[in-house]
């Protein structure tokens, strides 16, 4: 479902802390799932589910334009947050650790793109794990390494932490986006995104002068 709710004031530090907590002692788990300059004035957290059709729509139809206009130009830093909706999309649960493990080999975003591209194939499968290994082949990742990693408690904990942090931020559906104190829900179009990002960027840039 696509909708835009009024922006809600929520402390971004709470979301960041909740998501990063389990692996903070070893590494920042968000690094592999981040696009854009770390010093960009605007940060967007995308709370998403790889089996969600509206998330696929956002990824393939909206995000490429946002990346070109805002991320590549240094205005926005974009962070992907795992939020599998188990009751609706059970195969999103194993898909998320697969993406985490691809990220540990520096290939989160290519894995992200493949998962959404072939959602119609692996989504209905009773056991999608073997298909994820074919995606690992496409990414030139070692099957054994990915398989062991996907079952590792730290990968599962990373996804769980993301999901819990998303719920604490106020997200209840996917895709949802936490944008500098506001929550946007649904696969809203580029025409909706532009005035939101432009106004926040202008305000943040003015404060920095």
Where are these regions (language model features)?
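Short gly/ser/thr-rich secondary-structure transition/capping motifs
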Residues: 26-30, 157-160
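Divalent metal-coordination and catalytic microenvironments
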Residues: 44, 111, 146
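Bacterial N-terminal signal peptides
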Residues: 8-20
